[in-house]
Every structure is written in structure tokens, then in C-alpha cells.
Regions:
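Substrate-binding cleft of extracellular glycoside hydrolase catalytic domains
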Residues: 1-42, 46-49
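Acidic glycine-/aspartate-rich tracts in secreted/extracellular proteins
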Residues: 3-6, 145-149, 209-211
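Soluble non-cytosolic domains of exported or imported proteins
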Residues: 17-25, 49-57, 116-123, 183-190, ...
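Short, acidic/polar
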Residues: 18-36, 79-90, 183-197
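Active-site and adjacent substrate-binding regions of carbohydrate-active enzymes
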Residues: 35, 45-73, 77, 188-226
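Receiver (REC) domain switch/active-site residues of two-component response regulators
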Residues: 40, 95, 201
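Glycan-binding loop/region signatures in secreted carbohydrate-active enzymes
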Residues: 137-199, 220-226
Length: 226
């Protein structure tokens, strides 16, 4: 639920979250959709300005209905930010918290090319959520990107997939950058999987469709490392 939202869609979410009479209607539809499509649960991916008044109440109410139907609830949160409007009760309601340890730079920072998702970024995210916020590692998963950013232009930064880099040259599978194109290759993914295996419950991927569907697959790299 959520993710990248247009301004009009964002307003709809804000209105639902703030309205205690409308929230139950939305929640019932989410639960029914999950059941109709044989889903395991819901990931609440409302980010930044979309975390508004009513968010915590929504999460707590949604959790109650999902749990009653044996469905799980997770959230995707920035690597080193806890939104001030999220209460401790709401935070504890999630079965897992997915740490989005990527997008440390991107199109919004075109003049400063660099890695958007390094091992150090991942380590910082784990430290923040475990040691500063105090979430048990058993409830945390580490987000890894199957995409990167192209900083070859000083004015326009575009994203690209790991799969496209491997298609260009299989040697790119074991690199983290080609010129000013930055991404995660297999060695860095292995290091991140090791970090996750030692300190938390698993790996979250954004997103599977960006992988290389060959012997150089990052998903296969994750499976082999685990």
C-alpha cells in the first residue's frame, strides 16, 4: 500500500488516514483484496510527506483486521529516519520492518555522483534501527537494490536495472560502478547478505523485475549466500 504517489493519490491517502469513519472502509477493502488474491499480507509503504495524522491509528487498526485473518503486515522505512508521527505502538504492530538502505543519492542530487547503496549505508541503517530506535533484529530485513543511477549527465540522472548492466557486459556483474553509473554487483550483495544473516531476519529486494535472469542473477546470489 502506498509507494510512489501522485499528488492527487497522496491527497486521497491523507484524507483516508485522517478520517476515523473512512479508515475502516479502506481497511476492509485491503483485507478483502489480500484474501481474494491469496496474499500473505500487506506492506505499508507510505513515505515521507505521506506519513500524516492518522497514520499510526491506521496501522494499528489494519494490524487488528489482518491478524484476525492470519495475514501479516510489514513496513518499508528509510534507512536512517523514523517518522515523528509513528507511535511506538504502531511501530511494534509490524511483523517486519524493511530497511530501505538505498537512494542515499539520486536524481535529486545530480551534481554529486556516487554510490546510492553501499555496504556502509547498509551498516548505518542496521545500526540506526537496532541500536538507536531499538527494534529487535528479528523484526528487521535489509533492503537491497536491483537498480542503479546514471550520473553521466550533470543535470539529468536516470535509473537503470542491474539486468541491463549484465546484458551490456557480464563482467559488470562483479562491479559496483561503470564510470558514473552506480549500482550493486554480486560481491556487494554477498556482503550485505552476510550482514543481514548475522544481525537480522532477511533480505528485502527492490525489485525482482530488475534482475538479470541469467547465471549472474542477484537473486541467485542471495540464495546461494544464505
Amino acid at each position: 500500500a502506498g509507494g510512489a504517489l501522485s499528488s492527487s493519490t497522496s491527497d486521497i491517502w491523507k484524507n483516508f488516514l485522517a478520517n476515523s469513519q473512512d479508515r475502516p472502509i479502506l481497511i476492509e477493502k485491503i483485507v478483502q483484496y489480500s484474501k481474494d488474491n491469496n496474499l500473505d499480507g500487506v506492506d505499508v509503504d507510505l513515505e515521507w510527506s505521506h506519513v500524516t495524522e492518522g497514520y499510526s491509528d491506521f496501522v494499528i487498526e489494519l494490524k487488528e483486521k489482518l491478524a484476525a485473518n492470519s495475514l501479516g503486515m510489514t513496513a518499508a522505512f528509510p534507512s536512517e529516519t523514523k517518522y515523528s508521527l509513528i507511535t511506538s505502538e504502531a511501530l511494534n504492530a509490524f511483523d517486519f520492518i524493511n530497511i530501505m538502505a538505498y537512494d542515499y543519492t539520486g536524481p535529486w542530487n545530480a551534481s554529486s555522483p556516487g554510490q546510492h547503496s553501499s555496504l556502509n549505508h547498509a551498516q548505518r541503517g542496521v545500526n540506526y534501527w537496532k541500536n538507536i530506535i531499538g527494534v529487535n533484529g528479528e523484526k528487521l530485513t535489509l533492503g537491497v537494490p536491483f537498480y542503479g543511477y546514471n550520473f553521466e549527465s550533470s543535470t539529468t540522472v536516470n535509473s537503470f536495472t542491474y539486468g541491463s548492466m549484465v546484458a551490456s557486459s557480464v563482467s559488470n556483474a562483479d562491479r559496483d560502478n561503470v564510470g558514473n553509473k552506480y549500482y550493486n554487483g554480486r560481491p556487494t550483495i554477498r556482503d550485505k547478505v552476510k550482514l543481514a544473516a548475522e544481525t537480522m531476519s532477511g533480505i528485502m529486494i527492490w525489485e525482482l523485475g530488475q534482475d538479470s535472469f541469467t547465471e549472474y542473477s542477484l537473486l541467485e546470489t542471495i540464495h546461494k549466500k544464505y
